[in-house]
From Swiss-Prot:
Translation factor that promotes translation elongation and termination, particularly upon ribosome stalling at specific amino acid sequence contexts. Binds between the exit (E) and peptidyl (P) site of the ribosome and promotes rescue of stalled ribosome: specifically required for efficient translation of polyproline-containing peptides as well as other motifs that stall the ribosome. Acts as a ribosome quality control (RQC) cofactor by joining the RQC complex to facilitate peptidyl transfer during CAT tailing step. It comes from the Eukaryota. The keyword Nucleotide-binding does not apply. This is Eukaryotic translation initiation factor 5A-2.
C-alpha cells in the first residue's frame, strides 16, 4: 500500500441509476417521465379504456425540461416507465467568463465552473444584466440524467 492519500471530489452519484421505474398508470400531470431518452415534465395525461385486445393505455404529453420541446408517448397503463431523478439546487453567481461559462458558489464554499449560461433569451438577459448591475444573484440549476442547466434566477439584493 502507498502512503499517498487520494481525495476525490464527488461529482457523480456513484453509479446510481439516473432513472427509476414507475407504473404508467400512476404518473400524473406535473410529474416527470423519460420519453425518447429525454427527461420531461408531464403536462397532460389521458387514459383510454381497455379494448377488446389489450390493456388500458396512457397517453402522455410532456415538455423536455432542458430544451422545451414537446414530446408524446403512449404506454399500456400496467407497464413501467422510466422516471428521471430531477434535482434543483440554488447556487450564488460569482462570475461570468468570456466563453459563456458561469462560476457558481456551492453551499460547501467550493466553486462550480462547469455550467454554461442559459440558452433561454429572457433568462440569459436577466442573468447578464443583473450581474453587470452588481446585483447579488442566485441561480437555480436543474439536473437530471447527467445534464445540468440554469433554469431560474433570483435577485437577493445588491452587493455591499
Amino acid at each position: 500500500m502507498s502512503d499517498e492519500e487520494h481525495h476525490f471530489e464527488s461529482k457523480a452519484d456513484a453509479g446510481a441509476s439516473k432513472t427509476f421505474p414507475q407504473q404508467a398508470g400512476t404518473i400524473r400531470k406535473n410529474g416527470y417521465i423519460v420519453i425518447k431518452g429525454r427527461p420531461c415534465k408531464v403536462v397532460e395525461v389521458s387514459t383510454s379504456k381497455t379494448g377488446k385486445h389489450g390493456h388500458a393505455k396512457c397517453h402522455f404529453v410532456a415538455i423536455d425540461i432542458f430544451n422545451g420541446k414537446k414530446l408524446e408517448d403512449i404506454v399500456p397503463s400496467s407497464h413501467n416507465c422510466d422516471v428521471p431523478h430531477v434535482n434543483r439546487t440554488d447556487y450564488q453567481l460569482i462570475d461570468i467568463s468570456e466563453d459563456g461559462f458561469v462560476s457558481l458558489l456551492t453551499e460547501s464554499g467550493n466553486t462550480k465552473d462547469d455550467l454554461r449560461l442559459p440558452t433561454d433569451e429572457n433568462l440569459l438577459k436577466q442573468v447578464k444584466d443583473g450581474f453587470q448591475e452588481g446585483k447579488d444573484l442566485v441561480v437555480s440549476v436543474m439536473s437530471a440524467m447527467g445534464e445540468e442547466q440554469i433554469n431560474a434566477v433570483k435577485d437577493v439584493g445588491t452587493k455591499n
